[in-house]
Amino acid sequence: MQRELNRRQFLQLGALAALGAGCSSARSDALSYSVLVLGDVHFDAPDIGVYHAHYKPKAGSVAAKIFPMRMKREHDQWSGLMQRLAAAARKDIRPDTKFVLQLGDLIQGNCAKAAIHAKMLEDGFGYFKKTVSPDLPFVPIVGNHDVDGSIWLDKKPVREVYRETMLPKLSQELGQSIGNPTFAFRQGPDLFLCVDFNFPDCPRILHLLEDNPDVRYTFIVSHGAVVPVCGGSHFRWFLLGKKKDEVVRRKLYSELCRRRAIALVGHNHQTVFADLVTPEGRLTQFMATSVWEAEKQAAAQPRQTTPEGYAKIPKKAKDYDADEARALFGEYRPHLTDFFLSGQQGRCRLDVADAAVTMTMFGGDRAEPSRTFVLRDASAGLA
């Protein structure tokens, strides 16, 4: 049964959270807070020439086929829809909001030159910092488009362009030295572990978990899903999703379940909630998207609302044949207790307290929430 709140239940949980925070205002600030969450945003300019004038994908390649479609999408989004979403997100910030978290794909990429790619990162960060988060830390994690375009630009790895441009900004925003796209920070008693899903470093991830054993909630933040949820041909785009990584993937999954972690992810341009209970513990995943592709996507209706709708197996996919795909999803399907999937696009608010952790979804630039998901509810024994 999907744990979605009606208005009365939401108010009751809010009251419990306030009581659980204690009498001291300092303790309340530490234990009860909110985070504004943006999914993929694909910052771009309506004019293709601003960032993409030099990008010429090889004739006949997949990139050449999808590039015109991508550019039409970017033009449509950044001709008004994304500006409206950003303005609405600014209004979502409350006195208890501690920071703004962006789940990767800050920019579109496809720049062809290192200097232009760096400028796009600078401009994308600057736009959301100024428009949404001028007075709070703005924390974008790395997505595939943030290092997109090609492996090298001007004889320089794109990932190095990203590191040189973004890590100093993250260090300034968080007030700590960030020297790697996989990093961790604390918000009160909670751990936010942000990972580079493009180049996953499992030993580093496990080390950061080991260094923070005494936390209330563990949030693992990844652009790609921690638990694969898409049955399309590109479902391999999840954390440690290559077949060669299956041993470390299972090890990390087991550790996250043991810690009863909450995964905050993006990439698929969908809203997805998945809750899994295993012999080791529990892992809850929420996938968000802020790529507002069309007006109607602000009110998109659910496509799946039960575990039976999880992960339709594709006929073929890169890295996996059909039997291998069935085996992969078969590792997760028996543990799934709740599942929800929608094409709705917008922004989210994460509310964290002793009594509960909830995620509230707002479609497009709408002021009224569409639904609230319960990620943890201590009062119901679901912590």
Feature annotation, model-predicted:
Residues Q102, N110-H117, L121, L276-Q285, ...:
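C-terminal/domain-terminus segments
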Residues D214-S233:
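Short acidic, glycine-rich surface-loop motifs adjacent to enzyme active sites
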Residues M1-A18:
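N-terminal secretory signal peptides and thylakoid transit peptides that target proteins
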Residues D40, G104-D105, G143-N144, H223, ...:
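Active-site glycine-centered loops adjacent to acidic/histidine catalytic or metal-binding residues
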Residues R27-A115:
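N-terminal active-site segment of His-dependent metallophosphoesterases
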Residues Y33-V35, F43-G49, C202-I205, V229, ...:
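Short, solvent-exposed loop/turn elements at domain surfaces
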Residues K58-G60, A64, G109-Y217, W237-R260, ...:
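Extended active-site neighborhood of metal-dependent phosphoesterases/phosphodiesterases
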